[in-house]
Amino acid sequence: MIKISGKCSWFGGPLDHGVDPDEGLAFIYSVDEAPHLFLATQPAGTSGLARRLNPFVNYIACRWNYDETSVEKLLTTMVIVHSPKTKKTIRAFPADWGPHVDTGRIADLSQGAMRRLGITTDDTVNVSFPDGEELTS
């Protein structure tokens, strides 16, 4: 099992003005590859997948090591995200690579995931990538 721990923030969805309106994702190139992650329609004034992510779905961006976890595995596996502060745990879909190293954070989560965990930007999360736990739906 791969485990990392550190600070987090939120990203994606129509309200994320920290990403350009036409910004894509690192390993998902079309809505058809992971339709469960996206809003039904593209938000007005945008064309990129980052702003089309559904903020109510639990998704996560981490600096995935593609040698350890291939893109194919990322698209078929959920990770476990735990907040030591609130003691809450969720499962989340890998959706992107990030955050940038300069942020000092290890993960970016959807707004919905952060809300379910009861955390805010720069709170600590523990992220676990279980071996062999693939999505069944």
Regions found by a protein language model. Name each.
Residues 1-137:
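Secreted/periplasmic proteins
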